[in-house]
């Protein structure tokens, strides 16, 4: 006898359909027009450790900025609006249904100045013992800080995208109220994502943390980072970004080794468990400081391992955005610690000086940097169908407004009042139409190095170094010259002699 029984397996329903992120190659049509854009020589000079204010003087003109070889340089490259270009072909696109955008195809970041190693340090560095050389243990005292200098981790970095890069670091978190923490307890740590701005310090080998919030003695690290935040690029976050705007591609090279090994002086906040050691006599009854910390070193710099002063061509980006510069902007993030030489400058207190005396001279410190940015851009167009416009609006609502695509209000059918004398005391105050609000800069509260290329585009690629390299890799520029002798131009008047055929007998 056959009986029906319900199935024991679970019923799986299909997932709810969601909108997919598509590549820009699906809706961006590339043209055969290429443009070169390049900056002038970009220079910056300042103090490598801190920003200084001249005595008794105020204002930016009397401020010496902080310029270090261990800072991020984030260039905000402003491009011209291609929809306002005088194009050589007027039929290239339809302004009613299409919009033009730029695609980055090539970039070269030029770096001037010689290779060099820059050092940093602290005149009151928290070091107790040289834990590598055990014979050099110092006597316990209330203050064993010493003047120590280091050369940081060596880093070369290049990130290109149409949005600023995302950084990560650890900072002081919020502890739970129950139980209430004591003021001397180790604070909880919180992982934080922030935008990397121009002038932020790179991770130098001491960790990506907020030193101002987590190191209150200001002696754990060198001077240039003891009151600031060291950020590390969040490659995982930028690689997982849905639209791929923060990082079209990146190049990085890091190297470091530990030069010295110290331990920290202070009261151990967390005592070692007794099971970890056997107590001794006299000064060995209790262990000393076990907070060990090395000093980093970036080792040798060489021109054989340089990421800069060479071109890079973008054929396929790692994300869905294949080099399209939304809002006509491009962000280039550069770190190069292989040119971090600090210049020492000396002036005499009362010239002329005939005999050396240390108090007769004043010592100063400066750091200089030199950059040159070159780009190859390709002109592209987007056919704005309803589906594409809905997708772009979902990606960024301000993009269509930037292209002057807005909602047109319906015409008013009500009867409006219009006075003859608008400036009259006999009638109520007439308020004019409200002025449209100015466009807000999305990055007004952030600091970047602005590079304006809106009037520096050219189609003559062969007149610029990067343009010639682009033409060379795109194909040969001229036909090879033949070494064969040319045939005579004139034709003989007489006909050539013909061979007489032999007849068979």
UniProtKB/Swiss-Prot annotation:
It comes from the Viruses. The keyword Disulfide bond applies. It is found in: Virion; Host nucleus. Signal peptide: none annotated. Keywords: Capsid protein, Disulfide bond, Host nucleus, Host-virus interaction, Late protein, T=7 icosahedral capsid protein, Viral attachment to host cell, Viral penetration into host cytoplasm, Virion, Virus endocytosis by host, Virus entry into host cell. Pfam families: Late_protein_L1. One of its GO terms (cellular component) is host cell nucleus. Residues 476-505 are annotated as: Disordered. InterPro entries: Capsid_L1_Papillomavir (IPR002210), Capsid_L1_sf_Papillomavir (IPR036973), dsDNA_vir_gr_I_capsid (IPR011222). Residues 487-497 have a biased composition (Low complexity). GO terms for molecular function: structural molecule activity. One of its GO terms (biological process) is virion attachment to host cell. The keyword Isomerase does not apply. SUPFAM superfamilies: Group I dsDNA viruses (SSF88648). HAMAP family: PPV_L1. Forms an icosahedral capsid with a T=7 symmetry and a 50 nm diameter. The capsid is composed of 72 pentamers linked to each other by disulfide bonds and associated with L2 proteins. Binds to heparan sulfate proteoglycans on cell surface of basal layer keratinocytes to provide initial virion attachment. This binding mediates a conformational change in the virus capsid that facilitates efficient infection. The virion enters the host cell via endocytosis. During virus trafficking, L1 protein dissociates from the viral DNA and the genomic DNA is released to the host nucleus. Belongs to the papillomaviridae L1 protein family. Self-assembles into homopentamers. The capsid has an icosahedral symmetry and consists of 72 capsomers, with each capsomer being a pentamer of L1. Interacts with the minor capsid protein L2; this interaction is necessary for viral genome encapsidation. Interacts with protein E2; this interaction enhances E2-dependent replication and transcription activation. This is Major capsid protein L1. The lineage of its organism: Viruses, Monodnaviria, Shotokuvirae, Cossaviricota, Papovaviricetes.
């Amino acid at each position: 006898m056959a009986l029906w029984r319900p199935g024991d397996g679970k019923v799986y329903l299909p997932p709810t359909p969601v909108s997919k992120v598509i590549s820009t190659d699906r809706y961006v049509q590339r043209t055969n027009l290429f443009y070169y854009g390049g900056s002038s020589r970009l220079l910056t000079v300042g103090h490598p450790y801190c920003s200084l204010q001249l005595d008794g003087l105020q204002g930016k003109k009397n401020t010496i900025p902080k310029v270090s070889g261990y800072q991020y340089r984030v260039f905000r490259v402003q491009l011209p609006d291609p929809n306002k270009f005088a194009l050589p072909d007027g039929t290239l696109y339809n302004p009613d249904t299409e919009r033009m955008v730029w695609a980055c195809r090539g970039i070269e970041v030029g770096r001037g100045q010689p290779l060099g190693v820059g050092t940093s340090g602290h005149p009151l560095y928290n070091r107790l013992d040289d834990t590598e050389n055990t014979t050099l243990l110092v006597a316990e005292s209330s203050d064993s800080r010493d003047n120590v200098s280091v050369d940081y981790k060596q880093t070369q970095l290049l990130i290109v995208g149409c949005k600023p890069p995302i950084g990560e670091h650890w900072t002081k978190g919020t502890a739970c109220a129950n139980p209430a923490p004591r003021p001397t307890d180790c604070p909880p740590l919180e992982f934080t994502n922030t935008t990397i701005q121009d002038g932020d310090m790179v991770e130098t080998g001491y960790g990506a943390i907020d030193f101002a919030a987590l190191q209150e003695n200001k002696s754990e690290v060198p001077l240039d980072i003891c009151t600031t935040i060291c950020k590390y690029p969040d490659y995982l976050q930028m690689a997982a970004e849905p639209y791929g705007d923060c990082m079209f591609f990146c190049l990085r090279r890091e190297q470091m080794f530990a030069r010295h090994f110290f331990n920290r002086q202070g009261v151990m906040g967390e005592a070692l468990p007794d099971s970890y050691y056997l107590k001794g006599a006299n000064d060995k009854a209790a262990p000393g400081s076990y907070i060990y910390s090395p000093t980093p070193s970036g080792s040798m710099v060489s021109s054989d391992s340089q990421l800069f002063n060479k071109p890079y061509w973008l054929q396929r980006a790692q994300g869905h955005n294949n080099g399209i510069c939304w809002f006509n902007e491009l962000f280039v993030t550069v770190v190069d610690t292989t040119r971090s030489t600090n210049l020492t400058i000396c002036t005499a207190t009362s010239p002329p000086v005939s005999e050396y005396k240390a108090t007769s001279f004043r010592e100063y410190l400066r750091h200089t940097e030199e950059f040159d940015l070159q780009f190859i851009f390709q002109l592209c167009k987007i056919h704005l169908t309803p589906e594409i416009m809905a997708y772009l609006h979902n990606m960024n609502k301000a993009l269509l407004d930037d292209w002057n695509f807005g909602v047109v209000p319906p015409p008013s059918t009500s009867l409006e009042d219009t006075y003859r004398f608008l400036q009259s005391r006999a009638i109520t105050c007439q308020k004019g139409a409200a002025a449209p609000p100015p466009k807000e800069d999305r990055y007004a509260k952030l600091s970047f190095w602005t590079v304006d290329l809106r009037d520096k585009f050219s189609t003559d690629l062969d007149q610029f170094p990067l343009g010639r390299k682009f033409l060379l890799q795109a194909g040969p520029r001229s036909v090879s010259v033949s070494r064969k002798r040319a045939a005579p131009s004139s034709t003989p008047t007489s006909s050539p002699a013909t061979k007489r055929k032999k007849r068979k007998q």
